[in-house]
């Protein structure tokens, strides 16, 4: 049994599909302040995951091992955050259209004996997005709450030309690596 320090439905589904028993426990951590300090996406995502882990340990303790994670989307090392509105979502998606997009996830596992930090990157090469299709996606609102306004399992799927890496990383949790770490639980 592990404690997933996240409200993400996608991360919870990944754990369910992998057969890892868990309880989902949200934590309050504002990662926006970190953007002022960390410009490199890899440094930022690890700092955010560490912040979430610290908040989870403080709130819940380590009676149950904890997993915390953060994911960012980046194009040419520019961090693409969650869009605040439709216009920002359009700009973010236009940067991804026809480009290589890195989805970077830092996952941290912590129990009473050990802490394991795992950084993984999945890269997608996208074909240019169709303007009408993009407009329909924006109107649907499905981009809300998504890092980089990106849904590789939804809107972006048909534009994928090439994938380098694991789908689970792109979805926010390296469950294959977590299963190795937590196999004794």
From Swiss-Prot:
Its cofactor is a divalent metal cation. Its main location: cytoplasm. It is an enzyme of class 3 (hydrolase). One of its GO terms (molecular function) is nucleoside triphosphate diphosphatase activity. GO terms for biological process: nucleotide metabolic process. Its EC number is 3.6.1.9. It catalyses: a ribonucleoside 5'-triphosphate + H2O = a ribonucleoside 5'-phosphate + diphosphate + H(+); a 2'-deoxyribonucleoside 5'-triphosphate + H2O = a 2'-deoxyribonucleoside 5'-phosphate + diphosphate + H(+). The active site is at residue 70. It is found in: Cytoplasm. It comes from the Bacteria. GO terms for cellular component: cytoplasm. The keyword Cell inner membrane does not apply. Keywords: Cytoplasm, Hydrolase, Nucleotide metabolism. Belongs to the Maf family. Nucleoside triphosphate pyrophosphatase. May have a dual role in cell division arrest and in preventing the incorporation of modified nucleotides into cellular nucleic acids. This is Nucleoside triphosphate pyrophosphatase. It comes from Nitratiruptor sp. (strain SB155-2). The lineage of its organism: Bacteria, Pseudomonadati, Campylobacterota, Epsilonproteobacteria, Nautiliales.
